[in-house]
Amino acid sequence: MSGGSTGERPFSDIITSVRYWVIHSITIPSLFIAGWLFVSTGLAYDVFGTPRPNEYFSENRQQVPLINDRFNAREELDDLTSNL
């Protein structure tokens, strides 16, 4: 059996059609604007639970919270989070 048609439209026909560009001239900029608003309004910080740039360091603790001893990590973690 030779390679026959799958019944799908060729990609070149799709991207040269007016219908494709009418739909995508609206959806592509809309997705870009939605993503920009998602990040610029700070909603991305809330959804993913990441701290905002001004929340990385508290007033009491200005050093980077590093764990130095892996065998006593629980104690170091408790010390680092006790001021939060």
UniProtKB/Swiss-Prot annotation:
Q: Which domain of life is it from?
A: Eukaryota
What PROSITE patterns does this protein's entry cite? CYTOCHROME_B559 (PS00537)
Question: Where in the cell does this protein reside?
Answer: Plastid, Chloroplast thylakoid membrane
Residue positions annotated to bind heme are 24
State how the cofactor is bound.
With its partner (PsbF) binds heme. PSII binds additional chlorophylls, carotenoids and specific lipids.
Pfam families found in the cross-reference section: Cytochrom_B559, Cytochrom_B559a
Q: Does the keyword Chloroplast apply?
A: yes
* Cofactor(s) needed for function: heme b
Q: Which InterPro entries match?
A: PSII_cyt_b559_asu (IPR006217), PSII_cyt_b559_asu_sf (IPR037025), PSII_cyt_b559_CS (IPR006216), PSII_cyt_b559_N (IPR013081), PSII_cytb559_asu_lum (IPR013082)
Q: Where are the transmembrane segments?
A: 22-36
Membrane topology for this entry? Single-pass membrane protein
| A GO biological process held by the record | photosynthetic electron transport chain
Work out whether the entry's keyword set contains Endoplasmic reticulum: no
Single GO term (MF): electron transfer activity
Keywords assigned by UniProt?
Chloroplast, Electron transport, Heme, Iron, Membrane, Metal-binding, Photosynthesis, Photosystem II, Plastid, Thylakoid, Transmembrane, Transmembrane helix, Transport
Predominant localisation class? plastid
One Gene Ontology cellular component term attached to this UniProt record is: photosystem II reaction center
- Family per record: Belongs to the PsbE/PsbF family.
Note the subunit structure: Heterodimer of an alpha subunit and a beta subunit. PSII is composed of 1 copy each of membrane proteins PsbA, PsbB, PsbC, PsbD, PsbE, PsbF, PsbH, PsbI, PsbJ, PsbK, PsbL, PsbM, PsbT, PsbY, PsbZ, Psb30/Ycf12, at least 3 peripheral proteins of the oxygen-evolving complex and a large number of cofactors. It forms dimeric complexes.
Q: What's this protein's function? A: This b-type cytochrome is tightly associated with the reaction center of photosystem II (PSII). PSII is a light-driven water:plastoquinone oxidoreductase that uses light energy to abstract electrons from H(2)O, generating O(2) and a proton gradient subsequently used for ATP formation. It consists of a core antenna complex that captures photons, and an electron transfer chain that converts photonic excitation into a charge separation.
In its UniProt entry, what is this protein called? Answer: Cytochrome b559 subunit alpha
Give the source species.
Cyanidium caldarium (Red alga)
